[in-house]
């Protein structure tokens, strides 16, 4: 029998996919989700039909119904188990974590993966918990007011009931911990000294001890389970709440992508730790009270000396933890900066490679890492000292108490001493909880203060009014709008832009892909006194110079700006096409549908009017082709047309088009304008922002913007009659068109990255198939299986300094354990000597009374050895902490630098197939594990594992039978551990891998806020975030529960060793000295908790090593491109002098599994020439640029520059001699000067000269900081046109002999473009200039024209020759462009 089941599984591209039998599709946030049918299995479930509205069943116990059902001791398994077995667990199953047993057993039979793992319980999912958090916060605000509302109280209320149960279990744990040592063990020892005792009584005592230890184990395990599940719920609620607050804004200017990742990985985890570990304070306090009372009754007032030593640990632990948190705060600042720079470098890797900036940027990141490492060492040293202090403090406290007690000549016998030590055992365990609890609470407190800003953040002000007049679509009345901040303080104090110098006070524009065009960094309003009325069905044309406020006008309609005065009114639904297209990871169809229903006829019509048919035929899988992160394998024109198709398919009433025709050639531009804008959108209201003036005469209304004001408004004929600036622009356009026979502001052709990858099938056939194509662009992230290989540990040890260093660390840990055990043995030996007046004698039926050790004549000697041992233990512990901290941080830094250098040296094909979010997961999430968690767990594992071995050796001294039984139990435990750790490893790996799609989703959401809001997909993106968060939380909860599942069972089995020792003490070892019996029983009581802790921390340590495994996996994937410098080969002095470029039978393909894109190119470009490169989509023109920079290596043939084969020299030697002006303008965070001259190779005067040549001097001079004006992430505080001008200034400053201009003036108005062309001719005089798909005026002025087709040279001659040549392809392109002007 089969049943319907839905799974949401994260995939490598940042979305969710399934693996199973497809039943149906569901579009959410541009990604596809499936419903499956699976055979009955452990997690099969019955299909549940939705209940009719208003008939939802009310649980009999209200909100506590599910929790109270858990109190039923045994609950029969339902016929169809719930998706999460925890929901149907009874009390016994819950306490023993037995609900997880079927899944653990299944891991032995078959492979665990996303399909076989049950989904997260609805009680733990984001939906339910974020609603509860919202409700609790609203209640808090209604009671106390917004100013006095406490997030901490909301947190406490969120977990109040569960906290009460946790406290009850903690008290049970404390009572059970004291019951055995104080009441039962003395009876067992007393029984062992009797000659004739009741056997049943003795066995009963031993089993009573065993039972009390089992109760202790169960109560402690249950307490952890409650805390972990509560923390998962709060984590889900907090994450969803923050994301909902973040995404409600249509533009976010106060948080960058790196900072967003840092918040959702850092602060959210701090809150998780606070909820999970904070309740341990209750156990610690209860332990302190119980131990103080019991110790006083055993030994008297001197017991408080030991208690005082433990009490001193608490403020010491708090102090050290606060120091660690403070150091961690400073470390986080540097870490955030490193992650931000890494994110930008990976995003702009193509530009960095073409400009040979790898070494300087690698040095910047390595310097940040070096600074981060120093802070990590400070933080790690405090953490390590805290950990070691808590391990040795019981020994030191015991030594101080014994020394003072004996110095006061107070009575102390073996029975009194070990009863006292047994009483302190509980405090010994509880003291380990102090730093965990204090750190969790301290970190969560600071996270709460930062998170409170999300709570207190008011919703954005929606100023757009709905018009009542149905004849009007848009109305501006005296509207003045600005980009001033609307959501200050949204991120934590460590991440604020102003404090980190990322943005100045005036930088208040959105950081997404909108690209507002007004003058950046201006403190005044960007739009002044706008008065505008657009009738319904009207096409409004918007023109103006670069930075005049055109894009800001659209942003004002989208409610992304701040309305200072006046009003804005809209009537009808909106569609928006941004200047820089926003693409969702997935396939083309998903991007166009954007969650809408698939209508084939309408879909085909949209493809036709947006001129996508031919592109889909060229793409390997048609519209099902995966287009990668940010549309990596598409040209700018293809991305723009997909964005336009999305808008047209959405069928809205008002269309906001931000220069959509700038990224397409003349033929395509004319087709889109005629078929899409004029025909398909007929009857719709269209606001068309454009630099292509030839289309404005078809607009019903035209406005000309200048400095944020409407300087001209009317129809085309009206404005021409006024003979104002608009008329001058049009006349200039026609004058140039007449003189050159052609004037076009659109591009000749566009740049594809998947050139010539044509299918034999037709478009219609490609649209009929729904099968997911294989061999897609984005590589699926491979997850290792099974246990970690020795190779992982070997590489980590090598990174740490080698095996010699590891042996030194191991020696120090062995010494710590030896001194700890020696302290126990020496005290036992000392007690055995008694008063020294009577010789040691064996027990012969009466309890041995060796007298008061304070009366021993050699008291000073025993005290000296005991005290020196404690001092030596402290010194060794401090030295061990220092060395361990240095070594572990050296290892993580070495792995970081090695990975980064390897990734940096990868070819571009690597970055085309690996999402940036996945790489950031390595440099952020995985590295954080190596820096923060792995050192803590590995140090604890070393100490505890050696301690367990030492305890077993001591216990074995009592009897070889105990050793035999202990060995058998330990072997069983080891086999048990090895069998089931596979499942635990799978859970941890899945949790690690599930972070990548979550990161990608956050990045994608921040980049596309405008489109998300305008298409009404906010709820879809929130839902997807919740699904991704629930997937991660599910794996995290299963990992935590599985470690507790194994730890509990191992602890129960080690309790059997305690039972065995008790039986042997009671019945079998009368010849053993009494003091050694007592010592053995006291030590073995620590074995159960120590052994399970060793196993659990061992699992945690191995889980943290999966981060090393992932880093090594990426290192293995990284195949370096050619060396930067060739040994034994150097470029001629002053090369290249002429700039002559020769292609000789050149063949090229992008990757091994892709078609050839350049076929036998034979071409000679003479030095100092300007060559225009044109051709249709897929012709291979952009591939020439890739070949010239050796971003792709040749299959055959070669390229010569001034007679030098470019493959015979290093990449840096080649690329440093070339310059590029890219199609997509790239600016990095920093200053304007940094973006133009990142490494201070030019003077300020030279930079100002370059800015003057690109007509930016006036704009930059307005800023108070001039060249040191800050640039936010992605250059978000500059318009796209301004970014283009800065990129041109960068190339001018570089002054190379060969220049590649790749569609560099697409987003610049025609007047500025004319000036820029003059600048390029003057600045690059004497250089070889290759102009790919530039405006036709520039191509006509070139010395030669190269026409590409199907990866071959079709034509190459002077423009005037090609224009007159019959049948010339260039002439046909010119004719098409000319017709677009008519």
Swiss-Prot record:
One of its GO terms (cellular component) is vacuolar membrane. Its EC number is 7.6.2.2, 7.6.2.3. Expressed in apocrine glands (at protein level). Expressed at moderate levels in breast and testis and at very low levels in liver, brain and placenta. Localizes to axons of the central and peripheral nervous system (at protein level). Residues 504-523 are annotated as: Disordered. InterPro entries: AAA+_ATPase (IPR003593), ABC1_TM_dom (IPR011527), ABC1_TM_sf (IPR036640), ABC_transporter-like_ATP-bd (IPR003439), ABC_transporter-like_CS (IPR017871), ABC_transporter_C-like (IPR050173), P-loop_NTPase (IPR027417). ATP 1 binds at residues 544-551. Residues 1-163, 216-270, 318-383, 439-806, 885-930, 973-1049, 1096-1382 are cytoplasmic. Keywords: ATP-binding, Cell membrane, Cytoplasmic vesicle, Glycoprotein, Lipid transport, Membrane, Nucleotide-binding, Repeat, Translocase, Transmembrane, Transmembrane helix, Transport, Vacuole. Glycans are attached at residues 838, 844. One of its GO terms (molecular function) is ABC-type glutathione S-conjugate transporter activity. It comes from the Eukaryota. Changing residue 648 to I: No effect on glycosylation; no effect on transport activity; no effect on plasma membrane localization. It is a multi-pass membrane protein. It is found in: Cell membrane; Vacuole membrane; Cytoplasmic vesicle membrane; Apical cell membrane. It catalyses: ATP + H2O + xenobioticSide 1 = ADP + phosphate + xenobioticSide 2; an S-substituted glutathione(in) + ATP + H2O = an S-substituted glutathione(out) + ADP + phosphate + H(+); leukotriene C4(in) + ATP + H2O = leukotriene C4(out) + ADP + phosphate + H(+); dehydroepiandrosterone 3-sulfate(in) + ATP + H2O = dehydroepiandrosterone 3-sulfate(out) + ADP + phosphate + H(+). The keyword Repeat applies. Residues 504-514 have a biased composition (Basic and acidic residues). Changing residue 546 to M: Significantly decreased transport activity of DHEAS and estrone 3-sulfate; no effect on glycosylation; largely reduced ATP-dependent 5-FdUMP transport; no effect on plasma membrane localization. Residues 164-443, 808-1071 form the ABC transmembrane type-1 domain. GO terms for biological process: bile acid and bile salt transport; leukotriene transport; organic anion transport; purine nucleotide transport; transmembrane transport; xenobiotic transport. PROSITE patterns: ABC_TM1F, ABC_TRANSPORTER_1, ABC_TRANSPORTER_2. Changing residue 180 to R: Found in individuals with dry earwax and no axillary odor; loss of ATP-dependent cGMP transport activity; loss of DHEAS transport and largely reduced estrone 3-sulfate transport; strong decrease in localization at the plasma membrane; decreased protein expression levels, due to proteasomal degradation; decreased N-glycosylation. Belongs to the ABC transporter superfamily. ABCC family. Conjugate transporter (TC 3.A.1.208) subfamily. ATP-dependent transporter of the ATP-binding cassette (ABC) family that actively extrudes physiological compounds and xenobiotics from cells. Plays a role in physiological processes involving bile acids, conjugated steroids and cyclic nucleotides, including cAMP and cGMP. This protein has no ortholog in rodents. This is ATP-binding cassette sub-family C member 11.
